[in-house]
C-alpha cells in the first residue's frame, strides 16, 4: 500500500535555520529549501536576496500525515520564529525573510489559523502575531549550496545562527 503524502511550506527567515528542526523527524519524507510567493519564475538566490521578487525563503516539507500530522508541524514551526516581526527575522531583514505558513488544503488552513489564534491568546508575546497564512504557492527549490546547509557547513551554520540572535529569542520565549 502506498503511503499518502501531503505538503506544507513554512517561511521563517533564513531557510538555513528552518531545515534542521524538521529534518529527520519520523514521518517527514523531505525538507527542501527554496522560494515561494513571488512574481519571478525560477528565481535565484541572487534575485530573491534583493527583496524585490516578492518571494519568501521557505522550507517545503513532504510528510506522511498519519505519522506526523500537520498540527505537529505547526508545533515545531512556531518556536523557530519571532511571529511578531513584520520586517524579517532576527538579523535577516527584508520581505524575503517574513514569516508565513502556506497551506495545501482547507484543513491545513483551519489548523494554521487556530494555532495562530491560540498563540495570540497565550500572552506569550506583547506584540501582535503577524505571521501570514497563505494558499500554497509555486515552490522553486533553492540552489544546491543552500540545501542541508547545516550539515554541509556546520561551522558556518553555527556561527550564523549564533550571530542572528535566533537562539537567544527562542530560549527567552520558548525555553528551548
Swiss-Prot record:
GO terms for molecular function: L-methionine:thioredoxin-disulfide S-oxidoreductase activity; peptide-methionine (S)-S-oxide reductase activity. Keywords: Oxidoreductase. It catalyses: L-methionyl-[protein] + [thioredoxin]-disulfide + H2O = L-methionyl-(S)-S-oxide-[protein] + [thioredoxin]-dithiol; [thioredoxin]-disulfide + L-methionine + H2O = L-methionine (S)-S-oxide + [thioredoxin]-dithiol. InterPro entries: Met_Sox_Rdtase_MsrA_dom, Met_Sox_Rdtase_MsrA_sf. It is an enzyme of class 1 (oxidoreductase). Pfam families: PMSR. SUPFAM superfamilies: Peptide methionine sulfoxide reductase (SSF55068). Its EC number is 1.8.4.11. GO terms for biological process: protein modification process. Gene3D superfamilies: Peptide methionine sulphoxide reductase MsrA. The active site is at 14. HAMAP family: MsrA. Belongs to the MsrA Met sulfoxide reductase family. Has an important function as a repair enzyme for proteins that have been inactivated by oxidation. Catalyzes the reversible oxidation-reduction of methionine sulfoxide in proteins to methionine. This is Peptide methionine sulfoxide reductase MsrA. It comes from Halalkalibacterium halodurans (strain ATCC BAA-125 / DSM 18197 / FERM 7344 / JCM 9153 / C-125) (Bacillus halodurans).
Amino acid at each position: 500500500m502506498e503511503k499518502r503524502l501531503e505538503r506544507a511550506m513554512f517561511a521563517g527567515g533564513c531557510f538555513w535555520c528552518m531545515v534542521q528542526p524538521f529534518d529527520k523527524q519520523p514521518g517527514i519524507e523531505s525538507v527542501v529549501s527554496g522560494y515561494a510567493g513571488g512574481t519571478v519564475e525560477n528565481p535565484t538566490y541572487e534575485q530573491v536576496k534583493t527583496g524585490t521578487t516578492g518571494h519568501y525563503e521557505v522550507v517545503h516539507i513532504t510528510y506522511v500525515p498519519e505519522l506526523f500530522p500537520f498540527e505537529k508541524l505547526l508545533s515545531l514551526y512556531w518556536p523557530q520564529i519571532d511571529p511578531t516581526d513584520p520586517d524579517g527575522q532576527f538579523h535577516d531583514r527584508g520581505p524575503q525573510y517574513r514569516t508565513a505558513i502556506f497551506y495545501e488544503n482547507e484543513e491545513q488552513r483551519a489548523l494554521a489559523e487556530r494555532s495562530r489564534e491560540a498563540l495570540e491568546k497565550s500572552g506569550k508575546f506583547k506584540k501582535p502575531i503577524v505571521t501570514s497564512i497563505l494558499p500554497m504557492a509555486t515552490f522553486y527549490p533553492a540552489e544546491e549550496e543552500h540545501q542541508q546547509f547545516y550539515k554541509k557547513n556546520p561551522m558556518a551554520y553555527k556561527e550564523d545562527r549564533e550571530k542572528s540572535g535566533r537562539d537567544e529569542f527562542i530560549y527567552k520565549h520558548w525555553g528551548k
